[in-house]
A protein has these predicted regions:
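Core segments of cupin and vicinal oxygen chelate
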Residues: 2, 9-54, 95
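A short, acidic/glycine-rich surface segment
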Residues: 39-41, 61-67, 102, 133-136
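Short, charged/polar surface micro-motifs in flexible loops or helix N-caps
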Residues: 49-53, 60-62, 86
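Short amphipathic alpha-helices within nucleic acid-binding modules
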Residues: 21, 87-92
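Vicinal oxygen chelate
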Residues: 81, 90-138
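N-terminal beta-strand motif that seeds the catalytic metal site of vicinal oxygen chelate
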Residues: 1-19, 76-81, 127-138
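A short acidic-to-branched-hydrophobic micro-motif
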Residues: 53-56, 126
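Exposed loop/turn and edge beta-strand positions of beta-sandwich/beta-sheet ligand-binding modules
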Residues: 4, 39, 75, 110
């Protein structure tokens, strides 16, 4: 069996508010909203293309959550989104409350990237790939 990523799970003090931010920022769809047996509010989201599930929940009963960390760090450090225009998307996300942390950065022979702080101290990356030149090479 080939492994594939099943979902990403974010923890948030206000799961609905966080889910609605991702709806506005990246066209996620909210496909479920419930209080689980664990006592946490649990919001199920899907990416616009339906390829990635993102779950957003609060603390479970008797669970104390530490702070988020949008700085570079060990462990799961960020998740990335494709961008057709970094500057346009950075400005749009900043209007939604995100904060630019790094970039835009041009990787030699690679994409342009930028890192932003999203709600709940989640680090997200925007990736703008080089555009193909029409008519072929040279």
């Amino acid at each position: 069996m080939a492994f594939r990523i099943n979902h990403i799970h974010l923890k948030a003090p206000d799961p609905r508010k966080t889910a609605e931010w991702y709806v506005g920022a990246f066209n996620f769809k909210i496909v479920g909203d419930e209080t689980r047996v664990f006592g946490d509010r649990f919001i199920r989201c899907m990416s616009e293309d339906g390829a990635l599930a993102v779950n957003i929940s609060g603390a479970r009963k008797n669970e104390t959550l530490g702070p988020g960390d949008a700085a570079a760090h060990h462990g799961l450090e960020h998740f990335g989104f494709d961008s057709e225009n970094l500057e346009v998307d950075i400005a749009r996300l900043e209007k939604l409350g995100a904060r630019l942390l790094e970039g835009p950065i041009q990787n030699p022979n690679g994409p342009r990237i930028a890192f932003l702080k999203a709600p709940d101290d989640v680090r997200v990356e925007l990736v703008e790939r080089k555009k193909a030149i029409s008519g072929g090479c040279c």
